């Protein structure tokens, strides 16, 4: 016998008939339907995840090249040579990734893209990764369509001024007009810094790099503010670089990070390729001795064997990612270890003449911030 809906009752019939376990029949039917729905949903989501796992990496393999975004004109970091081929510190991390995927560092298309368009290009799916001095922030990291992977350069924001202003520290910039790049973390850091000091200032937000530098070099701005690495690079573009000085004040921390489209396999390939470069430097493996070391791995340190031996962790990782088991050796042979990349593009013998011994971008054992995650 059931309870029938009355004038104020629920709009359904509630049966009191029960089954084993004490549940009314109608609740048992609902329970079974819910279980079926949950199982179907789980299977569907599992199939979706499987279908999309490694999708971007597979696309790269099928097209035969990696597409990588860099700054279009940043001496030391990314700049076309006389043949129009991009060279530089950031470019080498594009080449690192291509070497890992294909065993050939040249299977990469380098695209010079302005900052305001770089992340949009990735989100739109028009490139696979970016290596162009992009600061990792919370809001960027949680943006759909982007994966921030690993920091390649620890930087900070600073100021460049004409020497004729005779300014020696940032606290003397009261009332200054500052040229800065629109859409970057630079603007917020300026507001925070000058706000703390209660100093008046004006900002010229100029997205186009050429226009921004022209405004600064021609005296329309008193100050140029950006990451220290960018300021050092930009100063080389002045008619007379010696006319400008970079102040010592650091007003922010800027972890410059490799970014890709979301894809676990691609992210892992990029991340662990960088770890290979760091670990290789730590153990003295470089582009000049890699062949000798891999030919006599039994004499190498266990950590080195784990990277390069075909029956150890590095090779096991490669098989899971679907790349060659010689990926690590290809990276070092084609691009070099992290120290080689730094010195070649940014070090004392380069146009930027950075002293790595005074930089956070050295190994922890040398007093820096860099160390390799364990490959085991």
Predicted regions and their residues:
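Extended ligand-binding regions for polar small-molecule ligands
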Residues: 92-101, 163-167, 171, 176-177, ...
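Bilobed "Venus flytrap"/periplasmic-binding protein-like clamshell domains
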Residues: 67-76, 86-101, 135-136, 155-207, ...
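Short helix-initiation/N-cap motifs at beta->coil->alpha
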Residues: 108-120, 203-218
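Acidic, polar ligand-binding/catalytic clefts
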Residues: 95, 99, 103, 107-172, ...
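Bacterial N-terminal signal peptides that target proteins for export
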Residues: 15-19, 26-38
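Bacterial N-terminal signal peptides
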Residues: 38-47
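Extracytoplasmic small-molecule ligand-binding "clamshell" domains
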Residues: 53-131, 323, 334, 338
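Sec/Tat signal peptide C-region and signal peptidase I cleavage site
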Residues: 31, 48-53
């Amino acid at each position: 016998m059931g309870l029938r809906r009355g004038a104020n009752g629920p709009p359904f019939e509630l049966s009191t008939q029960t089954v084993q376990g004490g549940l009314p029949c109608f609740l048992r039917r609902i329970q079974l339907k819910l279980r079926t729905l949950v199982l179907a949903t789980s299977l569907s989501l599992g199939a979706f995840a499987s279908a999309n796992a490694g999708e971007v990496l597979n696309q790269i393999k099928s097209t035969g090249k990696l597409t990588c975004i860099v700054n279009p004109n940043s001496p030391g970091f990314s700049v076309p040579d006389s043949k129009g081929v991009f060279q530089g510190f950031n470019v080498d991390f594009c080449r690192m990734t291509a070497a890992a995927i294909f065993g050939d560092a040249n299977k990469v298309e380098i695209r010079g893209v302005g900052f305001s368009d770089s992340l949009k290009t990735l989100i739109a799916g028009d490139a696979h990764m970016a290596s162009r001095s992009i600061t990792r922030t919370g809001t960027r990291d949680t943006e759909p369509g982007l994966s921030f992977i690993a920091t390649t350069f620890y930087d900070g924001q600073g100021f460049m001024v004409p020497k004729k202003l005779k300014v020696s520290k940032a606290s003397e910039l009261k009332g200054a007009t500052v040229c800065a790049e629109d859409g970057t973390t630079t603007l917020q850091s300026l507001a925070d810094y000058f706000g703390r000091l209660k100093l008046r200032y004006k900002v010229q937000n100029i997205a186009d790099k050429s226009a921004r530098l022209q405004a600064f070099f021609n005296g329309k701005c008193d100050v140029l503010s950006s990451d220290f690495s960018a300021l050092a690079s930009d100063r080389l573009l002045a008619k007379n670089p010696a006319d400008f000085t970079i102040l010592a004040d650091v007003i922010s921390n800027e972890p410059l990070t490799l970014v890709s489209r979301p894809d676990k396999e691609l992210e892992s390939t990029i991340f662990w390729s960088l770890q290979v470069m760091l670990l290789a430097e730590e153990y003295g493996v470089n582009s000049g001795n890699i062949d000798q070391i891999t030919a006599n791995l039994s004499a190498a340190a266990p950590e080195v064997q784990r990277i390069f031996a075909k029956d150890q962790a590095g090779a096991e990782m490669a098989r899971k990612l679907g790349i060659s088991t010689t990926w690590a050796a290809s990276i070092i042979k084609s691009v070099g270890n992290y120290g080689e990349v730094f010195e070649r593009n940014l070090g004392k013998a380069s146009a930027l003449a950075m002293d790595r011994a005074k930089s956070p971008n050295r190994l922890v054992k040398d007093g820096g911030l860099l160390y390799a995650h364990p490959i085991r």
